């Protein structure tokens, strides 16, 4: 959860930097789920949780790119419900990679307050997150560089325009609308804009690593 992005980040970074053959999987709930739903550097813009009662103003940390900056860490973002094949492939590659690996999996949480079906539909919620462009699927495999191949693979496509619909299906966002309607509109628009910029950045990484 938020631990990996925040109070536990120093330890995680030390493990990845060591170069040891260690596999790490982070279940990204975008908050501190185990301690009751506090805001973290994993939390997204506009998200309402403890310590961010008026919606988080800033965007989430790019944990994946920090790990990728070492150049020798296998990194992947997955969402099992959205693309099981990509998730299994990433896990298999991470296990086979002779060095540190980090897999960040999108993890719907009870505290997200999924409106339609709750956690019974968490797999569908993952699909919606990827389809909307809220969560991106990609992998960075340093081993491919030695084979003369592009180590960065972007699997997910650009958002289909359902970003606001996705936000409005989760109480962690909609609970901002009634008390602060203008702020909610501004933060939700900002969140979508940042998501589009993030995807454009990922597309540029595909070209950069060629």
What do these predicted regions represent?
Residues 119-210:
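Conserved acidic/glycine
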Residues 1-2:
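Active-site metal-binding loops of divalent metal-dependent hydrolases
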């Amino acid at each position: 959860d938020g631990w990996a992005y925040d109070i536990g980040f120093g330890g995680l970074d030390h493990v990845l930097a060591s170069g040891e053959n260690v596999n790490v999987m982070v279940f990204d709930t975008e908050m501190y789920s185990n301690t009751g739903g506090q805001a973290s550097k994993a939390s997204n813009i506009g998200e309402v949780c403890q310590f961010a009662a008026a919606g988080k103003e800033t965007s989430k940390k790019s944990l994946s790119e920090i790990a990728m900056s070492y150049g020798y860490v296998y990194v992947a973002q997955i969402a099992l419900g959205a693309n099981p094949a990509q998730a299994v492939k990433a896990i298999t590659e991470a296990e086979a990679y002779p060095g540190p690996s980090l897999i960040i999996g999108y993890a719907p949480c009870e505290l997200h307050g999924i409106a339609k079906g709750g956690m019974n539909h968490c797999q569908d919620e993952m699909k919606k997150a990827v389809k909307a462009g809220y969560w991106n699927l990609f992998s960075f495999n340093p081993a491919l560089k030695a084979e003369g191949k592009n180590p960065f693979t972007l699997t997910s496509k650009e958002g289909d325009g359902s970003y606001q619909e996705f936000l409005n299906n989760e109480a962690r966002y909609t609970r901002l609308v009634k008390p602060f309607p203008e702020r909610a509109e501004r933060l939700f628009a900002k969140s979508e804009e940042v998501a589009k910029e993030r995807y454009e950045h990922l597309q540029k990484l595909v070209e950069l690593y060629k």
